[in-house]
A protein has these predicted regions:
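Alpha-helical membrane-targeting segments
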Residues: 86-100, 106, 113
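Flexible, polar/acidic helix-loop-strand segments at domain edges
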Residues: 8-88, 92-95
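A general boundary/transition motif marking the beginning of the first structured unit of a protein
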Residues: 65-68, 84, 100, 104, ...
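Structural recognition of the beta-strand scaffold that forms the well-ordered cores
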Residues: 1, 54-55, 125-128
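C-terminal solvent-exposed extensions
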Residues: 101-165
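Short, glycine/acidic-rich beta->alpha junctions
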Residues: 2-3, 108
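Structural motif
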Residues: 1-2, 22
Length: 165
């Protein structure tokens, strides 16, 4: 788990992340503590840690609501990984580790990082679990489609789906 300060620090650590902001993101929440002000122009932007956090938190204005935000977050993660891979990964991991809450030891993470030699962020595939956005009492919920999730998992692992009908 990485908290807000960890996101800011990790993004700043790699010199920002370049993303294509799909539209002008503008939002104010004076009740947040501290108040949240988002104003990010549309187009390709190099986001520092503070702006990256705002980009990741923004949820209004996407045609497909929260799913749009998830897609934007996935785009951001790919761009951040691509940027981080251009650095000496062990030094980035060591510095970022203090911002990560995990039960995985630093040495285990560094060993796993060794598997990333020659890895390209272009090979990252992302998925959104099948389901349906459902509003309820002014809140938005995402109801997972168990059958769809099972079929996706089977597909990803090259297995045949089994109908229980």
């Amino acid at each position: 788990v990485v908290d807000y300060q960890g996101v800011i620090a990790c993004v700043d650590m790699i010199g920002g992340v370049e993303v294509n902001v799909p539209f002008h993101m503008e939002y104010t929440d004076i009740y947040d503590d501290p108040p949240l002000y988002i104003d990010i122009p549309a187009g390709v932007q190099l986001l520092d840690g503070e702006e990256a956090l705002k980009f990741l938190r923004y949820r209004k204005g996407y045609d497909n609501q929260d799913l749009g935000r998830i897609e934007a977050q996935q785009q951001f993660i790919k761009a951040a990984v691509k940027k981080a891979l251009g650095f000496q990964l062990p030094s980035v991991i060591k510095e970022a580790y203090s911002y990560i809450e995990t039960n995985i030891s630093m040495s285990d993470i560094l060993n796993l990082a060794g598997d990333l030699v020659g890895f390209s962020a272009d090979n990252i595939e992302t998925y959104i679990l099948p389901g349906m956005e459902t509003p309820l009492e002014g809140l938005s919920f995402y109801i997972p489609d168990k059958e769809g999730i099972r079929n996706l998992a089977y597909s990803l692992y090259g297995l045949n789906t089994i109908n229980n009908d």
